[in-house]
Amino acid sequence: MKFTKSESNQMINLEQNSEAWHKHRNNYINASEVAAIMGLNPFETKQALFKRKLFKEKIEDNNAMRHGRRLEPEARIFFNEVNNMEFVPAVFTKDFMSASLDGWHQESNSILEIKCPISYNSPSWSNFVLNNEIPMYYYAQVQAQLFCSDTEKAFFLVYQTFQSSKG
C-alpha cells in the first residue's frame, strides 16, 4: 500500500462489490475501516484489519452483510421517493482514503449512508431506536465519507423491509 497526498477528492468509476472495486479497496484506507483503526469497531480489531490489508484478504461474508446488500437498493429507492431526490452509489478517494457511498447527491452536496439491520435487538441498534444515537463505529465511517467526498451533509438511513413511504 502506498500513500500519496492530493489536494482534492476524486470520483472513481467503479461498480461496488465488483472485483475491480475489491482490488481498489486494497490500496486505500476505506471509510468503513476507520472505526477499526480507532478501536471502535466491535466486529473487527485493528490487528485483524492490518492482517486483512497486508495479505489482501477479502472480508468474510456473513448473513448481516448479505442482508444489507440485498436491501440497500430498496432502501435507496425508499429514501429517494420520500425526499424527492436522486441519490446514486459512488466511490470517492482523497489522499490515502477511499469511500464507497451508498448514495451521493451532487446538487445538495450530500451523502447517504444506509444500514439495514436484521434486528434492532442488539445494544447498538436498541440505543439508536431509544435515544436516536448513531453507533460510534458508524459515525466514524460517515465522517470519513464526508472527508473523501468533500460533501457538507450526511443522511443516515436505518431501513427494514416493513417501512413504507406512504403516510
Question: What would you call each of these model-derived segments?
Answer:
Residues 64-87:
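Acidic-basic catalytic patches of nuclease active cores, encompassing PD-(D/E)XK
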Residues 81-167:
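Nucleic-acid nuclease catalytic cores
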Residues 1-70:
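Charged, glycine-rich intrinsically disordered N-terminal tails and low-complexity linkers that flank
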Residues 47, 76, 142:
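Generic structural marker for isolated residues within well-ordered, non-membrane alpha-helices
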